[in-house]
Amino acid sequence: MAPRRRRGAGQDGSDDGRSDSDAPKNRPPNTAFRQQRMRAWQCVLTPKLIVTVFSILAAIYLGFGAWLTYLAHTVRDLKIDYTDCLTSAPKDDFETIPQNHITAHFSAKDSTFDPYKAQWKTTEREVQVANYTDNRQFCIVRFNIPEDLQPTISFFYYLENFYQNHRRYVNSFNAKQLLGDAVDGKTINDSTCDPITHDPKGTGKIVYPCGLVANSIFNDTFSSPLALAVRNSSDSSRPYNMTTKGIAWPGLKDLYGKTSYSLDQIVPPPNWERRYKYGYQENNPPPDLKTDELFQNWMMLAAAPNFYKLYQKNDTHPMLAGQYEIEIESNFDVTVYKGRKAFVITTLSTMGSRNIWPGIIFLIVGGICLVLDIYFILSFFIWRPRKLGDPSYLSWNQPSAPGGHSS
């Protein structure tokens, strides 16, 4: 007689009468990763490991901090604040600039070309702009370079207390308009360019480029430095030519294009009046933003209220020690927001212009790691050495514990 099969038993002897092929389809695969059987390692923080880690961190941070500090001190620079030039400097006669307006970092000292003995004066003359002349005020600054500066020589302008990171200011532009598209008036009016969207004179023309950022562009102009006297040379009145080409990041030009607007559709921003007194004309057309690197640098908004922006540079020729003169057309009013402005002539290191703070921060962190390292060495190996895993330190082995005993 054949054995009786249990009720509900399958052909494979399973209790539910189903084969492996009938298993639920949402069952995770039987792998170490999916079934959480991966091998694991847990770091045990032994005294030797802690001391080793802090020693390595201290060496890295102190070494890197010392290197950054050294690089910062190899940079040579001269910074002159010319905010008060038009109001304080005499007209047509040079006067010494107050020393608190000058900051210099040079390794050489030369009484003949002392960087803190800069001079300034103001002058006024007519300037030809397109098809008309305009009366402009200039600040002329004479400054000294006590040692030869090797290229690249960079010329920055510096603004203080100007908040480009304000929420409304940051968004005040139209990206499509900057790319060259002829964006219609309604779109501009509804965009974040408000309130700089249309001609304030009521003509209905579109402001190009619209927005607060473009309207507030830094519009002081600087000439290339003119060498008046060079050490060990009889040459005089020799220009040290600088260029505004190559001062912006290469990728920025992809964000801009030549405008598709016709001249009768657009007007310049209100603060551009000195450059476009009679608006955009055939002989004074709107700028080609794709090639205007000064504009591109200005549109790269600064995160802090005090910032530098590159204006011009010289990549090829050294700037010899001597006396130089620079002419500044001062148009950008910083007094309305209690700010300051200056220009900076500087060399560059591997890490860029002079900035001592990264090196200081690394040295501070490295110093903290070193102090902790010394503390752990003294604590674990000199003051109170103890054996790891000693059962006598367990709470129930302490004499004060109930039923405890000393081992």
Curated annotation (Swiss-Prot):
- UniProt biased composition (Basic and acidic residues): 15-25
* GO CC term (a single one): endoplasmic reticulum
Q: Identify the Pfam families for this entry.
A: CDC50 (PF03381)
Superkingdom assignment: Eukaryota
Q: Which family does it belong to?
A: Belongs to the CDC50/LEM3 family.
Its assembly, as annotated, is: Component of a flippase complex consisting of DNF1 and CDC50. Interacts with DNF1; the interaction is direct.
Q: What does this protein do?
A: Accessory component of a P4-ATPase flippase complex which catalyzes the hydrolysis of ATP coupled to the transport of phosphatidylcholine and phosphatidylserine from the lumen to the cytosolic leaflet of membranes and ensures the maintenance of asymmetric distribution of phospholipids.
Q: What is this protein called?
A: Phospholipid-transporting ATPase accessory subunit CDC50
The organism's taxonomy opens as: Eukaryota, Fungi, Dikarya, Ascomycota, Pezizomycotina
